[in-house]
Amino acid sequence: MLVSATEMLKKAKAGHYAVGQFNINNLEWAKAILSTAQECKSPVIRGVSEGAGKYMCGYDTVVGMVKGMIKGLNITVPVAIHLDHGSFDACYKCMEAGFTSVMFDGSHYAIEENVEKTTQLVKDAHAKGISIEAEVGSIGGEEDGVVGMGECADPKECKAIADLGVDFLAAGIGNIHGKYPANWKGLSFETLDAVQQLTGELPLVLHGGTGIPAEMIKKAISLGVAKINVNTECQLAFAAATREYVEAGKDLQGKGFDPRKLLAPGAEAIKKTVKEKMELFGSIDKA
């Protein structure tokens, strides 16, 4: 069932587990992630970046596809469609298209402008029953052209944004989009703890979930993280499985070139990755 992310994340924080946000890029990804969530009886958040939305022919197409799959696959677990790292304008476009959750990435604005824009979005999103995520402190790496240096957020700025009524908050704690470099210093749990102390029961979000050691993930959850974003790891798994299929010459055997067969190993690899993450996050049987 299609819902906002608010209640599932409140429940996750109270239950000391996290819900995974798995980004979708096409039909195969959407189907693999939805079916795995149903199998695992886990709530799930479908992340859609602005670039992925454009690739899939617009936000209306994304919503139509996900709604159709929920009906066609008889999906009964809670599902949110969430704009990932959205601009101010994109948030409104997604709300109009039927997204149930949006993230406003105002981390590149001065705190005063971030507060102003977030205040307006909170008012308009909540009027439609849509959940809203905000970000303080840019996440490292690149996400569809949005580049961050992996800085740590100012806990006081996090409180200022939290007090605006956002439903969950992404705070930079040294995390990075994409692959983590060998010299990565790890997550700043000191920052995360300080943010949680100031924001109370507000669910916190960890971006860049690919490659973070399991023990760090578990500690982050213990310090209030209730939503963890995963994208790169699914992409790598999909690419590796597809490469193996082609290099083994299976696309040349019979009708192995049929895209339904060609893309099947990649889809199975995504399902395996998603299930592993749901187990790690503790969300299995929490739907």
What are the roles of these predicted feature ranges?
Residues K255-K271:
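Short, flexible active-site recognition loops that position polar ligands and cofactors
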Residues A14-Y17, P259:
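Glycine- and acidic
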Residues Q21, T199, P213, P259:
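Metal-dependent phosphohydrolase cores
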Residues V3-K11, G15, L27-A52, Y59-T76, ...:
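Alpha/beta enzyme core
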Residues L206-T210:
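Glycine-rich beta-strand-to-loop/alpha-helix junction loops that act as flexible
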Residues Y245-D258:
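Active-site gating loops and adjacent loop-to-helix segments of metal-dependent hydrolytic enzymes
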Residues F22-N26:
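Conserved phosphate/anionic-ligand binding catalytic regions in large, soluble enzymes, centered on
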